[in-house]
Amino acid sequence: MAITTLDFNQFRSTSADERQIFCADLCETLSVYGFAKIRNTTLSNELIDEIFKYTRSFFALPNDIKAKAKHPNAPNPHRGWSAIGQERVWKISGFEQNKERTDSYNEFRESFDQGAADDQLFPNRWVDEDDLPGFQAFMEGFYKSCDELHAHLLRAISTGLKLPDTLLPSKHRHNTSELRLLHYPPIPCSALRSNMRIGEHSDFGTLTLLLQDSVGGLQVEDQRNPRSFIPVEPEDGYEVVINIGDCLQRWTNRRLCSANHRVMLPEGKDVDSEEVLDDRYSVAYFGKPDRDVLVDTLPECVEVGERVEYGDHLTALQYNQIKLTRTYG
């Protein structure tokens, strides 16, 4: 079983029928997997090459230089460089199913988080310009490019769900989304027998856009067969993997569900082997609603007589903080 790949050129077609087919296919794929792959997006191949160049360059910096932009040893502000072991995503595994983990394990990765350049609540943290020339300017521009693609996809999902095409975009007027660079250092296959590169989790926000290199290892839980995982292997490095976040699950009353995912051994690797896995790099844009927007089930997504699953009147910021506090707690 493989995650469906869609062509974004269909959404940009001058044919209304073609655009409608794309929107319907997108929502169908997301309803089955919680994930989809999209090629030919508004993120050009050149732009993707450049973001991976900067990602590798940033993580190659000495730790004392990266620490100039250090993420605090606390949930907020969720900005800057997190060293290996600082964030523990496994602690939110099962959160949406009201399940508490009783086990624990190590996660082998480091990350860098940023928000919008004008975010006054949680300002960004950067290394000095001389440490990595052009990094801040490029990252701020790339963030805007991801924001534009995210807005297109929100319109497509709204259309595919037969909602007003402005409904989901209207909840993202003041960008509070986050852009994350990730580095998974080399590690023996055998070390992942009882550990993970990143633990099983679902994403907090609306929709995640993911770019991954050729190493592999990303897996998504099969929504029709819980506890079975499907590999989301890279194709050519230029497709965008998208996945549903918890807020969209809540708004749609589970018509679209956020799927658990993790990073484990790539396909074809042996957990009993002492072979050392290569560095793995990825880039994730976590689309998130405006902080004061409620993430209750939307009335437009409830059929007559259907039970409303989410009515706890949490704002997007409150929900985000509940999960974030666990990962850095």
From Swiss-Prot:
Listed name of the protein: 2-oxoglutarate-dependent dioxygenase htyE
Single biological process term from Gene Ontology: small molecule biosynthetic process
Positions bound to 2-oxoglutarate: 280
Annotated residues for binding of Fe cation: 201, 203, 261
Origin superkingdom: Eukaryota
PROSITE patterns listed in its UniProt record: FE2OG_OXY
One Gene Ontology term of the molecular function aspect: dioxygenase activity
Organism from which the protein derives: Aspergillus rugulosus
Gene3D superfamilies reported in the protein's UniProt record: B-lactam Antibiotic, Isopenicillin N Synthase, Chain
Limits of the Fe2OG dioxygenase domain: 175-289
Cofactor(s) essential for the protein: Fe(2+)
Function: 2-oxoglutarate-dependent dioxygenase; part of the gene cluster that mediates the de novo generation of L-homotyrosine from acetyl-CoA and 4-hydroxyphenyl-pyruvate. L-homotyrosine is a building block of echinocandin B, a fungal lipidated cyclic hexapeptide that acts as an antifungal agent. This is followed by isomerization of 2-(4-hydroxy-benzyl)-malate to 3-(4-hydroxybenzyl)-malate by htyD.
Record's cofactor remark: Binds 1 Fe(2+) ion per subunit.
Biotech exploitation of the protein: Due to their effectiveness as antifungal agents, echinocandin derivatives can be used for the treatment of human invasive candidiasis.
EC number per UniProt: 1.14.-.-
The keyword Oxidoreductase belongs to this UniProt entry's keyword annotation: yes
Coiled-coil stretches noted in the UniProt entry, renumbered to this chain: none
Pathway stated in the Swiss-Prot or TrEMBL entry: Antifungal biosynthesis
Keywords, ordered alphabetically: Dioxygenase, Iron, Metal-binding, Oxidoreductase
Family note: Belongs to the iron/ascorbate-dependent oxidoreductase family.
InterPro entries: DIOX_N, IPNS-like_FE2OG_OXY, IPNS-like_sf, Iron_ascorbate_oxido_reductase, Oxoglu/Fe-dep_dioxygenase_dom
